[in-house]
Amino acid sequence: MAAQAVIFALMIPRLASVVMAQTVTKKEFAKYLARDLHCYHCGISDDTLVPQHRQNRGMGGSRMRSKPSNVVVVCSHSNGMFESSDRASKAAQRYGWKLRAGQDPLSSPVFDAYEGVWYLFDDDFNRIQVKAPG
């Protein structure tokens, strides 16, 4: 279902909000947009923005994984690349846009490529600027 939703969002970007509704509420997504402002990968800030679960939700989803620390805003094009390309997925892991199983979103920084800044997210829809990892 999730793969179909991503493909749908890529084919019809203006209807990406339909896909978004399957993962987070409109009210929650508005909070993500207020926090993130644009796609953390390319910087675009249009109607193609979607929530990217940093740690996969798995089949059937998980409420725990829908916490604000586990969601970053990206455009539907970037989301599709992260989910379909091994190379893009590995890059997304390096920058915190995707997390491996077992990684804690609260302690895993995420890179805003548009701003050139690393952030930590909390579960109250806040972001805190941090130094680059490593």
Give the residues covered by each predicted segment.
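Short, charged low-complexity linear segments at domain edges
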Residues: 11-24, 43-60
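Short Cys/His-centered divalent metal-binding micro-motifs
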Residues: 47, 68-94
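Short cysteine-rich loop/turn motifs with clustered Cys
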Residues: 23-50, 75-78
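Short linker/helix segments within small regulatory modules
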Residues: 56-70
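Arg/Lys-rich, low-complexity, intrinsically disordered N-terminal tails that contact nucleic acids
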Residues: 2-28, 130-134
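Short cysteine/histidine-rich metal-coordination sites, predominantly Zn2+-binding motifs
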Residues: 54-60, 90-100
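Short, surface-exposed beta-edge/turn micro-motifs
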Residues: 36, 69-72, 107
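Short flanking/linker segments adjacent to small metal-binding domains or redox-active Cys/His motifs
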Residues: 99-134
